[in-house]
Amino acid sequence: MKDIVVYFTGTGKNKKVAEAIKEYLKCDVIEVKDKLKRNFLRDSFYSLIGASVEIEPKTFDFKDYERVFIVTPIWAFNIPAPMRTFLTRNKDAIKDREIVFVSSCGLGEKNRPVINKLSKILGKNVSASLLIEETNVDSQVYKDIISKFLDNI
């Protein structure tokens, strides 16, 4: 089974998570980048209203992959606009793939309802999910958490 990690990061924490998954699974990785400078209020607002933003890459060919790891922060109890934009544009390309959601987020498991929002964006359920509290990324505990999670999916 060939895997790919698709990640977006605002502070760099989800990049660390994506790189840990890549290292553990020896898989490919792509970063979704938006063209806006970080602004807490605007970013939160865009997440709340479901706004689309300019991103790179706009689309991606997932034909060589069976499992897609979506790694992103959670902003204002929503998927950030850059990742939402990417997923909306690539929804058909990943519809037949297994989806795994991983996030480094401030509230950890309290953000679990966001997974339902992700499922609505994708039009399908995720097969597994992991919500890592940001403090675990700061303390380097996240690598153990990720490896245990990956061993069990």
Model regions: which residues?
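Short, aromatic/basic amphipathic alpha-helical patches
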Residues: R112-L122
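Short, conserved loop/helix-junction motifs that constitute active-site signature segments
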Residues: F62-K63, T88-D96, L122-G123
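Glycine-rich phosphate/pyrophosphate-binding loop and the adjoining helix
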Residues: V126-I153
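Residues at alpha-helix caps and immediate loop-helix transition turns in enzyme cores, especially N-
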Residues: V17, I79-M83, K110-V114, V141-Y142
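Short beta-alpha junction loops
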Residues: S103-E109, E134-T135
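Short, structured coil segments at secondary-structure junctions
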Residues: L25, I121-N125
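N-terminal beta1-alpha1-beta2 submodule of the flavodoxin-like/Rossmannoid cofactor-binding fold
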Residues: M1-V71, F77-P80, T85-T88, S147-I153
